[in-house]
């Protein structure tokens, strides 16, 4: 409240009822101004909530409101399709030894004079033009009948029947068909009913819903040991990209965690989103660098061992820049620094900068970010202040990429690994039992890890099922030599 426009001597000369009247209205004005400030803050919060979209929050694009701004790239001015100088793609002709059937077409008459054409003439004929058509064969299941022929024992005076070989067991389905069921479910995200229909329509095999579930559970058992081995290897990883998303077991809330490492991609379904679930995934002895967002469970790992995802921070600063308070300039400044950071990183990825040069160019960005966060921590906007103070606490985790080779500015690897699982969840609504949860973990881990290493999925799963049926252990998912993460 500003001071009165007159001095105490004037105040003392006023009639007694006038100062009393002024004091009443001054108090009313103070209360009104306080209420206005409170309502303005409330309006800003509601507007920020109304304006939330995938560009300024963690909200997925599928939940964006109609008025959300479209993230459109600037037009390049080029025509769509192949550009001048682009080397086109075409199908290479298969070698003759791989051709199943050859059909020769001969011209019989000349299109100009209608004369009969001669074949095998002495003249040099032009080169034979070849055109190949690729087709799928009609699939018929191979049905193998195993007959158990009893023999008579003259000593015991009884018939003796043989046992089925261990690799056959009592299953009505072979390892390859079983592997198809597991892969159609876990890799191609088909529901149990869709798998039944696909096998019937494409392969001519009738399988019941109950058999589909039994085959998935048996495959899960076959993959149990390699899955556990890959999961235990996370603790020895030098870098791990970790994220989590919601999952369901019947009507119960569950969480699907993922850890992408140099050697493998591990999935784990847990009952919580807390620290205990994180330690179950990465192990208590984890000493590498953890890529993550700012979810509280990750604080169990020291900041010097973390790299916060700058894609998440970019959305946070975008939200601050849209606030009609003192947070706006803080958010705009943060966006400028993030743009500089990504520009430097992209130049490093393109080979224009060495790692040492990238570190050097990040020094001024790091200094400006520190200044920004210190100013934002006392800017007068509670939202911006809380965010900046939180980032100051996590300061060692903001630019770990400048001190550790192999560290990236975003957690995109983990988020990309979860996308297929999210689509599967939306199509199948989660799992209905604990066995289903274990199958989800193991088949997702197996498929993602094999794709990461460019290994054949079907061949591995078939071999794992064959080993399981004979009481053996499937081969390891981990490579014999360290592999770098396959570029997505």
For each feature predicted by the language model, list its residue ranges.
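Catalytic center-proximal scaffold of phosphoryl-transfer enzymes
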Residues: 30, 38, 91, 107, ...
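Short, flexible loop/hinge motifs at secondary-structure junctions
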Residues: 1-169, 242, 248, 292
């Amino acid at each position: 409240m500003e001071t009165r426009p007159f001095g105490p001597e004037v105040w003392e000369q006023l009639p007694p009822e006038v100062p009393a009247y002024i004091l009443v209205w001054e108090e009313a004005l103070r209360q009104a101004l306080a209420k206005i400030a409170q309502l303005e803050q409330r309006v800003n919060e509601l507007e920020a909530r109304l304006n939330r979209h995938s560009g300024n929050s963690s909200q997925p694009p599928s939940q964006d409101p109609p008025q959300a701004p479209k993230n459109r790239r600037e037009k390049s001015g080029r025509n769509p399709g192949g550009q001048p100088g682009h080397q086109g793609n075409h199908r290479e002709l298969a070698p003759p030894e791989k051709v199943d059937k050859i059909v020769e077409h001969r011209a019989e008459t000349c299109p100009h004079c209608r004369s009969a054409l001669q074949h095998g003439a002495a003249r040099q004929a032009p080169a034979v033009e070849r055109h190949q058509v690729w087709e799928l064969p009609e699939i018929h299941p191979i049905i193998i009948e195993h007959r158990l022929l009893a023999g008579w024992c003259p000593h015991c005076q009884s018939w003796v029947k043989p046992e089925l070989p261990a690799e056959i067991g009592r299953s009505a389905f072979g390892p390859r068909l079983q592997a198809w069921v597991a892969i159609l479910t876990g890799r191609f995200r088909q529901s149990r009913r869709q798998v039944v229909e696909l096998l019937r329509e494409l392969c001519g095999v009738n399988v019941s819903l109950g058999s589909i579930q039994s085959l998935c559970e048996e495959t899960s058992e076959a993959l149990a040991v390699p899955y556990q081995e890959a999961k235990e290897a996370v603790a020895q990883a030098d870098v791990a990209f970790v994220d989590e998303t919601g999952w369901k077991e019947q009507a119960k809330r569950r969480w699907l965690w993922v850890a992408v490492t140099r050697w493998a991609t591990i999935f784990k379904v847990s009952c919580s989103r807390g620290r205990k679930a994180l330690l179950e995934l990465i192990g208590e002895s984890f000493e590498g660098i953890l890529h993550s967002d700012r979810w509280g469970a990750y604080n169990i790992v020291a900041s010097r061992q973390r790299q916060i995802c700058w894609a998440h921070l970019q959305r946070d600063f975008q939200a601050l820049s849209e606030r009609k308070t003192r947070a706006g300039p803080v958010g705009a400044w943060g966006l400028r620094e993030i743009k500089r950071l990504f520009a430097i990183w992209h130049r490093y990825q393109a080979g224009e900068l060495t790692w040492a040069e990238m570190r050097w160019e990040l020094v001024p960005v790091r200094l400006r970010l520190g200044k920004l966060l210190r100013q934002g921590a006392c800017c007068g906007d509670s939202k911006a202040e809380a965010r900046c103070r939180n980032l100051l606490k996590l300061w060692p985790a903001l630019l770990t990429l400048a001190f550790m080779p192999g560290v990236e500015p975003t957690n995109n690897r983990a988020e990309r690994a979860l996308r297929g699982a999210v689509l599967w969840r939306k199509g199948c609504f989660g799992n209905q039992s604990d066995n289903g949860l274990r199958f989800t973990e193991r088949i997702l881990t197996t498929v993602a890890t094999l794709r990461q290493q460019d290994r054949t999925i079907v061949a591995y799963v078939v071999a794992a099922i064959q080993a399981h049926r004979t009481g053996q252990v499937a081969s390891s998912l981990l490579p014999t030599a360290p592999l770098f993460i396959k570029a997505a």
